[in-house]
């Protein structure tokens, strides 16, 4: 099995990606388990931040690296919280504080204007100086609810309603979510690219 560092400290992302990637023969090790500090996310896009994170993890560990940068873009908010999704409520942000801030910010947004989209960019670097990283993007349309529902998932999942499923992302099973989510889409593209060379 090929050891690969996953450039995140987010336990939800580690669980979600590690289980799917282990089926592909990749031994995923979280960067925190290797003593790697988080890279500074100075990019202006999900793609830039994912490359920064992967390059940092590969450089520190000497291993191939996979990085994920993802977030929620709400149409009525001009794409916010976007790349700031994890820090939306400030320095001491938590999933709950971010979710509450978004609900408060959107309290006057009419129901027919609450469209949003989760985005996920996965980057694979074969080594720290890899000039041609694999970059895969997935997006998942939904609607921001007025109240949380469900206990699964993480982040904004309890207020992200998926019309095709008739429930929030937090009400989906892990298998259901992986099959249709932004991260599931990006991962499928990454696995296809790895498989084909």
UniProtKB/Swiss-Prot annotation:
What residues does substrate bind to? 8-13, 70, 154-157, 177, 182-183
Q: How is the cofactor bound?
A: Binds 1 Mg(2+) ion per subunit.
The gene coding this protein: rdgB
One GO MF term: nucleotide binding
Q: Which UniProt keywords apply?
A: Hydrolase, Magnesium, Metal-binding, Nucleotide metabolism, Nucleotide-binding
* CDD domains hit by this protein: HAM1
Q: Which GO terms describe its cellular component?
A: cytosol
Q: Which SUPFAM superfamilies match?
A: ITPase-like
Q: What residues form the catalytic site here?
A: 69
Domain of life of the organism encoding this protein = Bacteria
Assembly and interactions? Answer: Homodimer.
Which protein is depicted? dITP/XTP pyrophosphatase
The family assignment reads: Belongs to the HAM1 NTPase family.
* Its job: Pyrophosphatase that catalyzes the hydrolysis of nucleoside triphosphates to their monophosphate derivatives, with a high preference for the non-canonical purine nucleotides XTP (xanthosine triphosphate), dITP (deoxyinosine triphosphate) and ITP. Seems to function as a house-cleaning enzyme that removes non-canonical purine nucleotides from the nucleotide pool, thus preventing their incorporation into DNA/RNA and avoiding chromosomal lesions.
